[in-house]
């Protein structure tokens, strides 16, 4: 077993990614052929569940793009299910301290190294027990990325970086800016200073820094500072803004006057 994404991070090769929020396998496969190094299947803010994550993993599998899956929470039961359907790289949201980081790592490892439940006969990840010595190989193939998204997490960054089994730390600019008092403005100078300092600190500790940033200039700036996995766009945004721009070129205007609510 191997994890190409994990190996690329360990080798210091920057990985450029795209966020997937459309929650379906058809668009996931379409984007898997676009040339991105990694694709984030979002279970926190997109309408995904274990079944939809599975179908997207299957759709992406024939392509070079590597899947990264974000569960909705640092929950060992949910993590176990995602690993069993074939996720190897997880992005764990809202990790605040070293204990929570250790819990995330433990959830991805079989005993005695962790607490992952054994159900390989039912698991796509083990090819239904067709992979010899799966239990020993699986632990080494796991890639654990944790998100720091608050001032508390930033203050605990050094201890989070000391946790064995953490491969990378992802800075969440939207939640971080909100927690710092600048909701909706991740480009505020104070937020940017915090992000840049964190990238340098993470890389200096021998871990991979990551972030989502659709602003091209800032994304390149983060790469220059040492970020190793950078998502540079979101599928829903690409579709929405692209469709609006096309309509506008033909004189159409966005009209939401008939909308009575989000439902």
Swiss-Prot record:
Cellular component GO terms held in the UniProt record: cytoplasm
Site entry: Increases basicity of active site His: 84
Quaternary data: Homohexamer; trimer of dimers.
Annotated InterPro entries: Aldolase/citrate-lyase_domain (IPR005000), HKHD_aldolase_ent (IPR023701), HpaI (IPR012689), HpcH-HpaI_aldolase (IPR050251), Pyrv/PenolPyrv_kinase-like_dom (IPR015813), Pyrv_kinase-like_dom_sf (IPR040442)
Record's function text: Catalyzes the reversible retro-aldol cleavage of 4-hydroxy-2-ketoheptane-1,7-dioate (HKHD) to pyruvate and succinic semialdehyde.
GO biological process, one term: 4-hydroxyphenylacetate catabolic process
Residues the entry annotates as binding a divalent metal cation: 149, 175
Note describing how the cofactor binds: Binds 1 divalent metal cation per subunit.
Enzyme Commission designation: 4.1.2.52
Name of the molecule in the record: 4-hydroxy-2-oxo-heptane-1,7-dioate aldolase
Disulfide bonds: none
Residues noted as binding substrate in the record, renumbered to the chain: 147, 174-175
Family, as annotated: Belongs to the HpcH/HpaI aldolase family.
Gene Ontology MF term list: 4-hydroxy-2-ketopimelate aldolase activity; metal ion binding
Pfam families: HpcH_HpaI
Family annotation (SUPFAM superfamilies): Phosphoenolpyruvate/pyruvate domain (SSF51621)
PANTHER family assigned: 2-KETO-3-DEOXY-L-RHAMNONATE ALDOLASE, PHOSPHOENOLPYRUVATE CARBOXYLASE FAMILY PROTEIN
Record-annotated site: Transition state stabilizer: 70
Keyword Metal-binding: yes
NCBIfam families with a match to the protein in the record: HpaI
Active-site residues (renumbered): 45
Taxonomy, superkingdom: Bacteria
Organism: Salmonella dublin
Cofactor annotation: a divalent metal cation
Pathway: Aromatic compound metabolism; 4-hydroxyphenylacetate degradation; pyruvate and succinate semialdehyde from 4-hydroxyphenylacetate: step 7/7
């Amino acid at each position: 077993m191997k994890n190409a994404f994990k190996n690329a991070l360990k080798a210091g090769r920057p990985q450029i990614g795209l966020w997937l929020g459309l929650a379906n396998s058809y668009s996931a496969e379409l984007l898997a052929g676009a040339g991105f190094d990694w694709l984030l299947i979002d279970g926190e803010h997109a309408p995904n569940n274990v079944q939809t994550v599975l179908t997207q993993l299957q759709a992406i599998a024939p392509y070079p793009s590597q899947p990264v899956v974000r569960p909705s929470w640092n929950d060992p039961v949910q993590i176990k299910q995602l690993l069993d359907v074939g996720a190897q790289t997880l992005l764990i949201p809202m990790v605040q301290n070293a204990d929570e980081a250790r819990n995330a790592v433990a959830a991805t490892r079989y005993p005695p190294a962790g607490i992952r439940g054994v159900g390989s006969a039912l698991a796509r990840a083990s090819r239904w027990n067709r992979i010899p010595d799966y239990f020993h190989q699986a632990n080494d193939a796991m890639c654990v990325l944790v998100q720091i998204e608050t001032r508390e997490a930033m203050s605990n960054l050094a201890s989070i970086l000391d946790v064995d089994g953490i491969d990378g730390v992802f800075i969440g600019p939207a939640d971080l800016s909100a927690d710092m008092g600048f909701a909706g403005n991740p480009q505020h100078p104070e937020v940017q200073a915090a992000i840049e300092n964190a990238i340098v600190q993470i890389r200096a500790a021998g871990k991979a820094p990551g972030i989502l940033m659709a602003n091209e200039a800032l994304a390149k700036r983060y790469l220059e500072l040492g970020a190793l996995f950078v998502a540079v766009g979101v599928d829903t945004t690409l579709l929405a803004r692209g469709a609006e721009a096309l309509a506008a070129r033909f004189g159409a205007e966005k009209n939401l006057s008939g909308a009575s609510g989000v439902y």
